Design a protein with these regions (language model features):
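Non-catalytic interaction/targeting regions
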Residues: 1-483, 487-538
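Outer-membrane beta-barrel "beta-signal"
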Residues: 544-553
């Protein structure tokens, strides 16, 4: 059997690499149009073309089973756009923008028959035609500079448009407030759909505005509003999911989930944008216009603070679950509270403490490690369960988990896991779990377990094998240490151990027990396990398990 990996097929049209040709629309997407440098450019909006915009995009994926997923695209569309001064969202007829959006994904069987499809709509509701897309604004192709006191005027033009000098700007050309994903069976019948709503420009469904802010403190006055002038960008707030509604094939809502967000308390940074424009140059003088604006560089994060899920039943009853989230100064989850508004008894709280919550905590203070969990607790129904992690460093200064403790209902600390020795990579060589000692030795690069010994200590191993073992481990010669134990395994009568060998691709291919039982693992060329065999005393392999995959050629 020869296995095949998934194959990707991309659209046949490729980008034109000729540097003398400009084949992009005003949004920066490939449109197949040829404009030579010698031609006089058009300083206006260039229309996108779907055929060329799809250049080199993913068209289909063929799986080893012979099945296929096909992707269909369409151009972005918007039904509103942001004003040039970034202070308002104005409705407009549905219009086409550059860039692609996913229209459908069709899953086919090996014979080409349709299994299922998912269709996407970007309208405000299932039966509406009005696009929920909002364009970030019109491209600016010319800017006029005017120093009235000197009677100087300068008009700059750009065929590609002028980009804004903003900070933290990653806003797409079109953002969608609502996306509908509909599941369809092989006959084209709807199986129901999900409606997703997101934060976007303007005011969201919770009444919160995510529009950008104008600059201030400028020495520039203008009779015309230019969209490319500096502004404070709030893109960090946009694109967050606000609600997810599930509808059945009859259009009845069966479940809804809503999300609320909050800003962290980090103060924005005041940022200066400055330009120097040469208005006039002669052999004897140069006139330079100096322009400046002040904006803010946002430093806050926009994190989910509440999630509410409602299950809707045919009898009109609902079951609601609320989840509340809080975060620490590093934006890591601190608490997650789950509650039923009608049943306080069901309230459950899960909380976390990290290394950044306790500055100076060793061994992290000198390593800049902020996200290591120190404590994790769960409280519900009057009961509590707490887990505590204690860390250490080995002789090479590498941090590792030293102890794992459990405290049930405020009782005594129960050490469930404790490491007594590590290798140079911080991997545990000797540890105790719930009172049982274990020894494991990794490869010389610290990536694979070569030896695993149950119910034995490293000291007991050294006593049985000899002092050479302690020397190999102290010198980080882990391969030699494993080989020494393997050669003397017959002396270790009271220990349970297993030895492991790996292929170059990190796959386990042989496992040997102390008693001499050898297990072999065979893989296909997709790295899927196809055979596990045992070598018996007559030197013959006996297949224990076989795995077959439905590959098609």
């Amino acid at each position: 059997m020869v296995a095949q990996k998934s194959d990707e097929v991309r659209n046949d049209i490729t980008f034109n690499k000729n540097y003398e040709e400009s084949c992009y629309d005003s949004w920066g997407y490939y449109n197949g149009k040829i404009e030579k440098i010698s031609d006089y450019p058009s300083f206006s909006l260039s229309s996108p073309k779907l055929e060329f915009t799809k250049a080199e995009t993913l068209k289909s994926i063929t799986y080893p089973t012979g099945g296929k997923s096909e992707f269909e695209y369409e151009l972005n569309e918007y039904g509103a756009k942001v004003s040039n001064d970034h202070t308002a969202v104005n409705e407009c007829p549905n219009s086409i923008s550059g860039g692609l959006r996913l229209r459908s994904v069709t899953n086919r069987d090996y014979d080409g028959s349709i299994i299922s499809s998912k269709r996407y709509k970007y309208t405000k509701d299932y039966k509406e035609t009005k696009s929920s897309g909002i364009s970030k604004g019109e491209m600016q192709f010319s800017i006029e500079y005017n120093i009235q006191s000197l009677g100087l005027r300068l008009n700059l033009m750009s065929a590609g448009g002028f980009l804004s000098n903003t900070t933290s700007m990653n806003t797409p050309d079109v953002g969608y407030s609502t996306v509908i994903a509909e599941d369809v069976d092989s006959l084209g019948n709807s199986l129901g759909y999900k409606k997703f709503q997101f934060t976007n420009f303007g005011t969201d469904i919770n009444g919160v505005s995510h529009l950008d802010d104008k600059a201030w403190g400028s020495n520039v006055t203008s009779d015309k509003v230019y969209s490319c002038l500096p502004f404070t960008c709030k893109s960090a707030e946009r694109g967050k999911i606000l609600s997810e509604e599930v509808f059945d094939a009859n259009g009845n809502k069966t479940e809804e989930t809503s999300y609320r967000y909050s800003k962290t308390n980090k103060t924005d940074i005041n940022t200066a944008t400055q330009q120097a424009i040469i208005m006039y140059r002669s052999p004897t003088s140069t006139v330079v216009g100096l322009l400046g604006w002040l904006t803010k560089t946002p430093r806050y994060s926009y994190l989910c603070s509440k999630m509410t899920t409602k299950e809707l039943y045919d009898n009109g009853k609902t079951y609601q679950t609320d989840k509340y989230f809080t975060y620490n100064s590093c934006n890591l989850l601190s608490t997650e509270t789950t509650a039923n508004p009608n049943n306080e008894i069901e309230k459950a709280i899960r909380s976390y403490t990290y290394s950044c919550d306790k500055p100076g905590t060793e061994p992290f203070a000198g390593h800049g490690i902020k996200s290591a969990i120190l404590e994790e607790s769960f409280t519900a129904n009057g009961m509590s369960d707490k887990y505590a992690y204690r860390y250490g460093t080995n002789v090479y200064g590498v941090p590792f988990v030293w102890q794992y403790l459990r405290i049930y209902n405020g009782g005594t600390d129960n050490i469930e896991y404790e490491v007594t020795k590590t290798d140079k990579f911080g991997n545990p060589i000797e540890f105790v779990t719930k009172g049982t000692p274990y020894v494991q030795i990794f490869s010389d690069d610290g990536t694979h377990v070569q030896l695993f010994v149950e119910d034995a200590t490293l000291e007991e191993l050294c006593d049985a094998v000899g002092e050479r073992l302690a020397y190999y481990i102290s010198q980080c010669e882990y391969y030699n240490a494993t080989g020494l134990i393997y050669n003397k395994r017959d002396k270790l009568t009271n220990m349970h151990m297993r030895f492991f060998n790996y292929l170059g691709s990190d796959l386990l291919f042989e496992e040997t027990t102390k008693e001499g039982l050898r297990y072999s693992y065979i893989y296909d060329n997709s790295n899927h396990l196809i055979d596990k065999s045992l070598l018996y005393g007559n030197n013959k392999w006996q297949t224990l398990k076989m795995y077959e995959y439905n590959y098609r050629h």
